[in-house]
Amino acid sequence: MSHPLRSLPKIDKILQESRFADHSKELLTTLARDYLEEIRAQFLQDATPIPPSESILQEVERRYEASLAPSLVPLVNATGIIVHTNLGRSVFAPELIEEIKPLLTSYNNLEYDLKAGRRGERYSHLHGILKAILGCEEVLVVNNNAAAVFLILHTFAQNQEAIISRGELIEIGGSFRIPEVMKNAGAILKEVGTTNKTHRRDYEEAITPQSALLMKVHKSNYDIVGFTQEVDLQELIELSQKHNLIDYYDLGSGFLESVPFTNEPTLKKIASLSPSLVSFSGDKLLGGAQAGIIFGKKSLIDRLKKNQLLRMLRVDKFTLAALEATLRAHLLHDYEKIPTLKMAHLSLEELEERAKKLKSRVHGYESQILQTQGYAGGGALPNQSFFSIALALCHPQKSPMELEQSLRARGVIARIEQERVLLDMRTIFTSQLESLAQILNEVF
């Protein structure tokens, strides 16, 4: 009697199947080999029956199609979290994409000086507009704020002391820890104060001839309340000037215009204090592309540009184009091109109107329009919530978790509160309401 494993089709026979005539032979070979190996392993482990040849061919074809499908897909963000890190943070307006499309579909002057006819500098493209908006001496853009932190520490505090409050030794998403970053950058961490209280004298008493930098980190994803004390940026700047040190503020998020649900200072206000160096993210409340934007003293940023690490951390043409377009929209107060800010400023009346439109198009659910709370997200504005409007849904047969899973499978990311699935209107675009209603009716 023939061994069951002998019934498995050979790789070359699979490749010769007419259904695979237009398929990539390299990819098909890899997928078929992997699947056949799985079948062998399962059979040898617990004698799992060998599937018929046709079933094997169908599964190989399914895997082939799945492997070619984009892994990044558009979603409906119904969570109410505006800058949702897991969902790609800030969204670009279609008008902005159209604006930068010619730069991405043709050659451009990324590193070419059109006036001089020779090699230029890619960082010059954001130089003028950022200086105009912030009123600072100089700017530099790297590929994210973590890169900015590392570059600054590596340039100015390698084998020297970077003094920081114990209450600001944060960890953010992905296990990004400030102490580890400082260590990897070659800086000597010198923590001062306590978790809840740090005074100016704590910094001053810690300063030695080996000190290079006074660092302040924005507590982006948590807050300390109650019996607390911290040294503000103005004091840190004064102290650094007194002792001829560099003050550096890792702002994390940062925003140019006033956001309705926070009393934190804007980037313009921070820049007006003339700090040595500040860094923040381009894709959080600024509403642009992922980038780490550094501004401050020209002499210091010139030194950053000479660090060989900058070559590894530099931004590409898409980032520069998207950031420039976003900053231009800020400069012209054209917030239609900055969805992040537009969402933040939506009134409850506008949100309720969206909820009513969606509710009228959905059938069979027990639904209710209610006021809820949302957050900025992206590690910005910790513990600062704002009012929003949501459509709360209950399904007659499915549990809230089952309904949430069904929606998620169709690209709708919602949240569950009090045994109901909530669709927060603040982060759902009006252009998505029709398709969202269709999905909800299909799920029902």
Swiss-Prot record:
One of its GO terms (cellular component) is cytoplasm. It comes from the Bacteria. Its main location: cytoplasm. Converts seryl-tRNA(Sec) to selenocysteinyl-tRNA(Sec) required for selenoprotein biosynthesis. This is L-seryl-tRNA(Sec) selenium transferase. It is found in: Cytoplasm. Its EC number is 2.9.1.1. Its cofactor is pyridoxal 5'-phosphate. Pathway: Aminoacyl-tRNA biosynthesis; selenocysteinyl-tRNA(Sec) biosynthesis; selenocysteinyl-tRNA(Sec) from L-seryl-tRNA(Sec) (bacterial route): step 1/1. Belongs to the SelA family. GO terms for molecular function: L-seryl-tRNA(Sec) selenium transferase activity. Keywords: Cytoplasm, Protein biosynthesis, Pyridoxal phosphate, Selenium, Transferase. PANTHER family: L-SERYL-TRNA(SEC) SELENIUM TRANSFERASE. The modification N6-(pyridoxal phosphate)lysine is found at K284. HAMAP family: SelA. The keyword Cell membrane does not apply. InterPro entries: PyrdxlP-dep_Trfase, PyrdxlP-dep_Trfase_major, SelA-like, SelA_trans. It catalyses: L-seryl-tRNA(Sec) + selenophosphate + H(+) = L-selenocysteinyl-tRNA(Sec) + phosphate. GO terms for biological process: conversion of seryl-tRNAsec to selenocys-tRNAsec; selenocysteine incorporation. The keyword Isomerase does not apply.
